[in-house]
Regions:
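Glycine/threonine-rich beta-strand-loop-alpha-helix active-site module
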Residues: 70-176
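Gly/Pro-rich interdomain helix-loop hinge
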Residues: 268-271, 275, 279-362, 405
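Short, amphipathic C-terminal "tail helix"
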Residues: 361-407
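Carboxylate- and glycine-rich phosphate/diphosphate-binding segment that chelates Mg2+/Mn2+
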Residues: 147-253
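Flexible, glycine/charged-enriched surface loops at secondary-structure junctions
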Residues: 204-213, 228-238, 253-258, 276-279, ...
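ATP/NTP phosphate-donor binding region
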Residues: 1-86, 343
Length: 407
């Protein structure tokens, strides 16, 4: 038996943030990063709408990109003191992901972070509070998913929390919020969304319910991501819907090893000042993983179907030719978005940059542990081709050096 779960309500279109006025409750806590949502007035608007609904409002701000276990615990402690019956997370993937984990700890104070990371092992929520997610970036789609990503910086590892219990009750997809994204964020989150859709379509858990969402998301991203990156606000608005569709698909079809690798490489080089932003990691790894997965005949045929919908190769081309066309197309899209093709070149587009570089000797020294951790990641189980540790090491090397995947 399979399951398909979405938020009960999804408000979309410009002005959708006003839906907060209709919420019923006594207290609401707003979880936010604090930067752009404050600067552009969306935090003030959210607070005023909730107060208009008759609620007392508390703001928990300062949630960092790639939120830490410590931030989750601080937020849960604030919730215990305030006792909200609504948790409203507003911003990109980081504040929403953090708030989801805080929600678990708020409802179950005895729950440890290790408990949260047990796949589909979260106890029943909503005994204390309901959850609303308001997305401001067009990529993570965490506003509609059963996932959260939290980083344990003491280990340098990002851990996915996966359970349908943390699917938000309400999602607000208001494109006005996404219009504030800086150019680089448009690129990274957009390729995150493309990866979600492609991985969902070839996942071993794909279904008749998720396939149409994934394919339509791919078509929309193909048409709108690069124009959005170049300042077309109508395309930016459509991308906000596209990434949400991709999220609905992958939340139910699950993901694959692009995400496993991104989770385990994102923070592991942080001690060298080299943080590989999640969307950029996905963009770099996706073409390599497609080449690896295409050795599986079922996956190869499904990549071929994606190419048929995209129209980037003749219908009568072989599946092998279609896979090559898809890889070439995605690499070309990365070029247009100024995203490098490999870890070795990561950060070269904006030196000196906030990400830093990943030294070759450090990468090779940590390669085995990264491979082991990637295989243990929750996303690996639904990948169409299961890699050995040795194969994962080879694949990661291809992602570092931008070499051909021929195994």
């Amino acid at each position: 038996m399979a399951r398909f779960t979405l938020p009960r309500d999804l408000y979309h279109g410009k002005g959708a943030l006003e839906a907060l006025k209709s919420f019923k409750g006594k207290k609401a806590i707003i979880c936010v990063g604090g930067g752009s949502m404050k600067r552009f007035g969306f935090l003030d608007r959210a607070e005023s709408y909730l107060k208009e609904a008759g609620m007392k409002v508390m703001i928990f701000d300062g949630i960092e990109p790639d939120p830490s276990v410590e931030t989750v615990m601080r937020g849960a402690e604030a919730m215990q003191k305030f006792q909200p019956d609504w948790i409203v997370a507003i911003g990109g993937g980081s504040p929403i992901d953090a708030a989801k984990a805080m929600w678990i700890k708020y409802e179950y104070p005895e729950c440890t972070f290790e408990d949260m990371c047990k796949v589909f092992g979260i106890p029943e929520l909503r005994k204390k509070a309901h959850f609303c997610a308001v997305s401001s970036t067009s990529g993570t789609a965490t506003e509609v998913t059963a996932f959260s990503i939290i980083t344990d910086y003491s280990k340098g590892i990002k851990y996915p929390i996966a359970d349908f219990e943390i699917t938000p009750d309400v999602a607000i997809v208001d494109p006005e919020l996404a219009e504030t994204m800086p150019k680089k964020l448009v690129a990274h989150t957009g390729m995150d969304a493309m990866t979600h859709a492609v991985e969902a379509y070839v996942s071993t858990a794909n279904s008749d319910f998720t396939d149409p969402l994934a394919i339509h998301a791919i078509e929309m991203i193909m048409n709108d991501l690069v124009p959005s990156y170049n300042g077309d606000m109508a395309a930016r608005d459509r991308m906000h819907n596209a990434q949400c569709l991709a999220g609905m698909a992958f939340s139910n079809a699950l993901l694959g090893i692009v995400h496993s690798m991104a989770h385990k490489t994102g923070a592991v080089f942080a001690d060298y000042g080299a943080h590989i932003i999640h969307g950029a990691a996905n963009a770099m790894y996706l073409p390599k993983v497609i080449a690896f997965n295409a050795k599986d005949e079922t996956a190869k045929k499904r990549y071929g179907v994606i190419v048929d919908y995209m129209g980037i190769a003749p219908k009568d081309a072989s599946d092998d030719e279609k896979v090559k066309a898809l890889i070439a197309y995605l690499r070309g899209m990365n070029d247009q978005l100024n995203i490098p093709h490999c870890i070795k070149n990561y950060g070269a587009d904006s030196y000196p940059c906030e990400q830093g570089f990943v030294p070759e000797e450090v990468f090779l020294e940590r390669l085995h542990d990264i491979a082991v951790n990637a295989i243990a990641d929750a996303c690996t189980g639904s990948n169409p081709r299961q890699p050995s540790v040795e194969e994962m090491e080879k694949l990661l090397k291809c992602c570092y050096y931008d070499t051909e995947v021929d195994f």
